[in-house]
């Protein structure tokens, strides 16, 4: 009887650990790096943020899809409470969406982007989901934001208005949803750590052994 209970405990612990690892592997939330000591001057302007405390934050990973020419798309949000932070549209075309001179002047020639063929849309500035972006971005992308080439959906989907000439003039447009700052993640999506599982499992085993003895 004792052997069967111990074997059952082992199976339960093994199952919990594997479930936790699977959740972490499939999670859309990726770790971000803070680098306050070694600030980059030639960083990627799209994947670079400055958080509320003044730390430099580099986004490691984003959700990325390709939009075919002349077709609309819907992006489902991986975030339960906060639908979207921002997106940028990147074109494979040699014609830049952002003029080179405009981009470089606003960034004082520090953050040059080869081709400057990117456009960012900051979403929902008046909501809790809005994350302040790097200090130069609002100037660069202000006009595009005001044109409202997107709308919010009740189903947590971002609907791109593909009839807009800026989107349809390119053969392929890449739409990427920028991940939020880790501290702003929805706590309901976070998984239990392996250390916590190990401690709980150990306490459970001690409790079972006391019942047996």
Swiss-Prot record:
Name it: Putative transmembrane protein DDB_G0267860
- One cellular-component annotation, GO: membrane
So which stretches are on the Extracellular side?
Answer: 23-191
For this protein, the parts annotated as crossing the membrane are: 192-212
Compartment(s) of residence? Membrane
Which keywords describe this protein according to UniProt? Glycoprotein, Membrane, Signal, Transmembrane, Transmembrane helix
Indicate how the chain sits in the lipid bilayer.
Single-pass type I membrane protein
Leader sequence range is 1-22
Which residues are sugar-modified? Answer: 92, 114
Q: Which residues lie on this side of the membrane: Cytoplasmic?
A: 213
